[in-house]
């Protein structure tokens, strides 16, 4: 680790910025579009479909709704959404791999609408074959997400939600590293 990396590792966590009411409507619109994109793509998450096709459909949906897909060309990222299949923890790049019955797939959607970001993701089980371990991981991480959301308050540091959401929950069986659960 070089000196600048070492310094950034130890800096104080930034506080959550408190916005006024005029900003909330923009945040809601961007977040809603990101969520609607996941609702839109849900019926297409089927065995035999490629993640490239899911990316194309999401890109068109986001563009047709007046927004930009934030990941596209961000630090060279080549796609409009992130698709993480099975053991890929996060930020997988859509491609020609066909989804199989029983795959787990996380689709991460980030949009920019009127200058505001909306970012969300959803975990899918492809087809009707669910592996018990995958079902358990999905269940406990969903629980951890809601525990973390409940800890977020104005004036709190951004780094506090991660440890708080897993302590004492079934998620403590998994490892939390940065923004990923492995």
Positions of the model-derived regions?
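Active-site neighborhoods and metal-handling regions in enzymes and metal-associated proteins
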Residues: 1-182
């Amino acid at each position: 680790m070089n000196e600048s990396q070492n310094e950034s590792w130890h800096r104080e966590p930034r506080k959550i910025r408190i916005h006024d009411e005029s900003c909330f409507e923009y945040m809601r619109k961007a977040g809603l579009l990101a969520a609607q994109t996941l609702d839109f793509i849900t019926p297409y998450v089927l065995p035999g479909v490629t993640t490239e096709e899911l990316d194309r459909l999401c890109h068109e949906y986001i563009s047709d709704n007046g927004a930009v897909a934030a990941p596209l060309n961000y630090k060279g990222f080549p796609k409009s959404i992130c698709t993480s299949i099975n053991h890929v923890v996060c930020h997988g790049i859509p491609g020609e791999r066909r989804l199989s019955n029983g795959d787990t797939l996380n689709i991460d959607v980030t949009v920019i609408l009127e200058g505001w970001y909306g970012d969300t993701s959803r975990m899918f089980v492809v087809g009707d074959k669910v592996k018990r371990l995958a079902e358990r991981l999905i269940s406990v991480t969903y629980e951890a997400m809601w525990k973390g959301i409940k800890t977020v308050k104005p004036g709190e540091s951004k780094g506090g939600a991660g440890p708080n959401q897993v302590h004492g929950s079934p998620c403590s069986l998994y490892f939390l590293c940065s923004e990923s659960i492995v």
